[in-house]
Amino acid sequence: MIDQKIFEITLNIDDPANFCTNVEAHLLKELENIYVGKCFKNSFIISITGVIQRSPCFIMRTNNSGRGYMHVRFSALVSYLNAFDLIAAVKIIKNDNNIILGESLLTEPVTIVIPSSESQNNVAEVGQIVPVQLANSSVYYIPGRQQASATGSIFIPKHTFSVYHVQEELTQEQALNLTKLVNVIETLLDSRSKKDFKHICFFEKLYYTYPISSDEILDLKIWKGPKGKEVSRLKPCNVLSFLYDALKNKSSSLGFWARPPDLFKSSPLAYQQDNNSFNTTELPIICSAEVMFVTLLKEIINYLQFMNDLCDTFNNEQLIKRHENIWMLIEQRKI
């Protein structure tokens, strides 16, 4: 994820007299030299975007070095990965001793260790590109390093899903706070509309839970399941439309919400019902409407970005064909 972050640091200054001749220029140069292109505080810093606050340059009095220091608060454009993030393109650079080592082609520099099962070890070849899901609490940003490290596995679609029990209405103010995430989804959907439809169909079919044919890949905003196959008695709700109605107090968020596997994960759809009749053994998660919608919207963003990235990475038939062994592995290991 790309974001803005604010950092507070103490900067050591070797030559205070020279530094103070042009504090702004020297400070920005020092920050760029020390932090840009490196890991710091659970992020990879892309660029310094501004100095928010700084102290005067103090002289160290604990020794006779003549060095100085300054307290600085600055903002930076950063990239960071979270547990369970999906990365569409990880290039295999090593595959032996039951360990697959890969480098992400799409995110900040990160080396990913994939503890392989025997089948994965036999299938994934050095130089191939595989879709990966990061493991829980597996991303490490060691300060000063030029790349992060993580563990993950070749991403296989799963049947599991969560049910959320909302007992309080979403307020207009909370709905307004969610519009930033809604805008991200709409931008991703617009980007998707410009991609090769055959490639979209291929990857949606690959990562859909149930058997379908490519001509059944419909508009994600109205998707209701494979043709001629009733996978749910409920009519899915378009989360984006629901939130626009919530801004006008025209919708109720009470009840049980879920995104079971009969929906495309990259669709902006979810089910809402008064009583929990979802087919899962997991207990419902009781949470506020705002927390539930943030969770659903971020999941939609994650999958939409993943699908768009797959289409951008494997953007021709030859490249898709060269990775048939990977697609076969994914099909065979679907739960």
Swiss-Prot record:
A single GO BP: viral transcription
Biological role stated in the UniProt entry: Component of the DNA-directed RNA polymerase (RNAP) that catalyzes the transcription in the cytoplasm of viral DNA into RNA using the four ribonucleoside triphosphates as substrates.
Keywords: DNA-directed RNA polymerase, Host cytoplasm, Transcription, Viral transcription, Virion
Induction annotation: Expressed in the early phase of the viral replicative cycle.
Species in which this protein is naturally found: African swine fever virus (isolate Pig/Kenya/KEN-50/1950)
Family (UniProt): Belongs to the Asfivirus DNA-directed RNA polymerase RPB7 homolog family.
Keyword Zinc-finger: no
Main location class: host cell
Coiled-coil intervals: none
Segments crossing the lipid bilayer: none
UniProt domain comment: Contains an extended C-terminus, with no homology to characterized proteins.
Protein name as catalogued: DNA-directed RNA polymerase RPB7 homolog
Complex formation: Part of the viral DNA-directed RNA polymerase that consists of 8 polII-like subunits (RPB1, RPB2, RPB3, RPB5, RPB6, RPB7, RPB9, RPB10), a capping enzyme and a termination factor.
